[in-house]
Amino acid sequence: HRHIIKTEDIINRGGATLAIEMFESNANGEIDLKAPVPVFCDGVAKMFNAGDILRLAPGESVTLAPGNWHKFWGENGDVLIGEVSTVNDDLTDNVFAEPIGRFSEIEEDVDAIHLLVSDYEKWNLL
């Protein structure tokens, strides 16, 4: 997925290696399979080839700008990820290459204690 407005720092807070596959956007906002991908790793500007996989050890981070397509997963175990980002509307700022839901469906069996932004409409709090 990519973001329209949001810039985000993704931080591997602990656990295994965080792998991030990266692409840049073309002029139409689609995945560009050839363009280099500029990012900042721990504050240092770096350039990657389209489709490269950046691997972050615990304590390392990457800054992804709007238009950077990214897919991430834990390699060889679970990873605790932290995110610090610019203010945005997560309901409209996420663009997915293939239509998927942002969160998996949850069968609610107790009342919510802490709400996500996307929960407010469901709980009639808007």
Residue ranges and their predicted role:
Residues 26-47, 73-126:
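Double-stranded beta-helix
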Residues 1-2, 33-35, 55-57:
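Short amphipathic beta-strand/extended segments with alternating polar/hydrophobic composition
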Residues 50-76, 82-86:
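Conserved metal-binding segment of the jelly-roll/cupin
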Residues 20-22, 56, 64, 72, ...:
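Generic structural hydrophobic/aromatic packing signal, biased to beta-strands
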Residues 1, 21-23, 82:
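Residues in well-ordered beta-strands of folded domains
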Residues 3-4, 12, 74-77:
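Short glycine/proline-enriched turns and hinge-like loops at secondary-structure junctions
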Residues 5-26, 39-46, 55, 87:
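Short, conserved beta-strand element in jelly-roll/cupin
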